[in-house]
Design a protein with these regions (language model features):
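Mobile cofactor-carrier "swinging-arm" domains
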Residues: 1-79
């Protein structure tokens, strides 16, 4: 099953974030709850965790790019 990884809301008034650093690469195995990317907002650095266990099949927003809250940033194919 394909699982979307969306940029979560990090606080009141925060509508976007810049993907600072991917901790996992495409094709790597991820565990549910594992931190996969760090996102920089106007207020802090936020860690985004994998919503499912499986393979990170596609990164849709590269490090250094900005995305709106709830935008899909990656795809995980569940084991």
């Amino acid at each position: 099953m394909t699982v979307r990884v969306n940029l979560p809301k990090s606080g009141m008034g925060i509508e976007e974030g810049t993907l600072a650093r991917w901790l996992k690469a495409e094709g790597e195995h991820v565990e549910k709850g594992e931190v996969i990317v760090e996102v920089e907002t106007a207020k802090a650095i936020q860690e985004v965790t994998a919503p499912a266990t499986g393979k990170l099949t596609k990164i849709l927003v590269a490090a250094g790019e900005t995305a709106l809250v709830n935008t899909q940033i990656a795809v995980i194919e569940e084991d």
